[in-house]
């Protein structure tokens, strides 16, 4: 059997590698690797999923998803964000990952370029390669709040550029892209006739009233921008595998044809759960309060550990911690921390070559476990 180079060239990601190592060690390991919260989804959402299964709603839906589920997403977008979105502008996918793959596969030809600001979620780069495109990484600096500048993006644009990926709030940094950076990217997209994919899966988790501007909502981006979102983070439903794209109808229609040949449709019980999640009876505010409390524990704890620094956490449930003062690279730090103190974090190198002096901490465990992890982290850096 001969396997393809396009797949053999995809190395296992560092987040998954550390996650797997933590599971293999087991015992009292505190796993802060994946963005997979331990808080349960709202009770009515769980009940809706169970009711769908009991009613044997376990077959196929339309390729783009149930009309009622797409309309539930559209209605939420209209009510929450004032967006002019109809069900026909929405396709439900197998998680946000499904949206990323299907969008890029629909938008780029082999040899086209995709601009990916870093630090980046690892899937953007790998999926671009899988589609035959060339990812062009633009590395943001910590002193700029991890927001790329207009000059950086402009310098990365070539005649082969087709797509710019925007991820705000950002994974892994937990930072929100500054408004001037958002407007600069929009201006460049218009000038060079580029499409922008806006990954907004953490939008519901912005803290302290920090201003948030979606590039999708700028009038000049109408028809040249899409949104990726999911129930995963907003409602703590990572295992339900239900994401979606909002975008121009030609893109949604193309993705629907692609989905027929890739996944058929998103899982039907999860679609019914999403209808409940976006319904008027759902209160997910407890999730926000829990993550906000954990964020404070992490921010206060990191700033009290010698050798570590943290610029800030605007949103999501990640802290991108600078470890430069320890003199260690990110992989040595992460592997050493796991071996010696049984705490699993992700090396910053996973999110771009420029970030080997960072680690990512996911505060997806209880406050008690976070405090224990911070104590072990202090012991590791001060030994």
Where are these regions (language model features)?
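Extracytoplasmic catalytic/substrate-binding loops of multi-pass membrane glycan-assembly enzymes
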Residues: 11-13
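A short acidic, glycine-rich active-site loop
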Residues: 57-60
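PLP-dependent class I/II
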Residues: 3, 8-9, 18, 22-30, ...
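Short beta-strand to alpha-helix junction loop
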Residues: 64-65
